[in-house]
From Swiss-Prot:
PROSITE patterns: U_DNA_GLYCOSYLASE. It holds the Pfam family UDG. InterPro entries: UDG_fam1, Ura-DNA_Glyclase_AS, Uracil-DNA_glycosylase-like, Uracil-DNA_glycosylase-like_sf. The keyword Hydrolase applies. Belongs to the uracil-DNA glycosylase (UDG) superfamily. UNG family. Coiled coil: none annotated. NCBIfam families: PRK05254.1-1, PRK05254.1-2, PRK05254.1-5, ung. This is Uracil-DNA glycosylase. It comes from the Viruses. It catalyses: Hydrolyzes single-stranded DNA or mismatched double-stranded DNA and polynucleotides, releasing free uracil.
Length: 255
């Protein structure tokens, strides 16, 4: 009997473990996030297939961000430290993408949407010094998860990877954050981000909604259910909520 178990049960278990380990090696996400997400082998295979699709596209088109930066959000921000989640759409398609939503490197000009974000932080925090660069790494290191809902894009074609399969993965991340953490602040700017509100448990998290910070949205006179981004007060509300629940507020300064 023991021999039969060894051949037909234990050996299969070992094979399954080996296969799952191989899948893990193909997913360049911080191990802390892999442990946190607890993806099934099926979901891991699904993600690996998506990564292989993106890798194939890179052979014939320019894809942003670079392969090594797609999951940089996972390396700058540990899952158990997350306290604010800011959702973006897809990465910058002009070459500035860093893997963090809205962020650019210190050598790139600050994009218009990020300039408006800085204006709103200034209105919320008198101690905020408007930076000359748009690198948001300091926010990420404090537990601000800057997550695009689509993690790659073709050069010059916004939204070009929206149907590749990223949305199921980032929805899964949002759901895990909502389920496993307590008293986080989710900032949802624009209709695409606001669609994610249904994934978040509002009984234990604060969900803040506004129009998108882009200048186009700021100038628009179209009726909206949501307030304009400029004047929304999200950064002040976020820190007040964090302090109310015994968490350190975010220092929004970048330098």
């Amino acid at each position: 009997m023991e021999r039969w178990l060894q051949l037909h049960v234990w050996s299969k278990d070992q094979q399954d473990q080996d296969q799952e380990h191989l899948l893990d090696e193909k997913i360049p996400i911080n191990r802390a996030w892999m442990d946190f997400l607890q993806m099934s082998p099926f979901l891991k295979r699904k993600l690996v297939t998506l990564l292989e699709t993106v890798a194939k596209l890179r052979t014939s088109t320019v894809v942003y961000p670079g392969e090594e930066r797609v999951f940089s959000w996972s390396w700058l921000c540990e899952p158990t430290q997350v306290k604010v989640i800011i959702l973006g759409q897809d990465p910058y398609h002009g070459g500035q993408a860093t893997g963090l939503a809205f962020s650019v490197s210190k050598t790139d000009p600050v994009p218009p949407s990020l300039r408006n974000i800085f204006l709103e932080v200034s209105a919320c925090d008198s101690q905020f010094a408007v930076p000359l660069h748009g690198c948001l790494n300091n926010w990420a290191r404090q537990g601000v998860l800057l997550l695009n809902t689509i993690l790659t894009v073709e050069k010059g074609k916004p939204g070009s990877h929206s149907d590749l399969g990223w949305i199921w993965f980032t929805n899964y991340i949002i759901s895990c954050l909502s389920n496993q953490l307590d008293h986080c602040v989710f900032m949802l700017w624009g209709s695409k981000a606001i669609e994610k509100a249904s994934l978040i448990n509002t009984n234990k998290h604060l969900v803040l909604k506004s129009q998108h910070p882009s200048p186009l949205a700021a100038r628009s006179n179209r009726p909206s259910l949501w307030p304009k981004f400029l004047g929304c007060g999200h950064f002040k509300q976020a820190n007040e909520y964090l302090e109310l629940h015994g968490k350190c507020p975010v220092d929004w300064n970048l330098d």
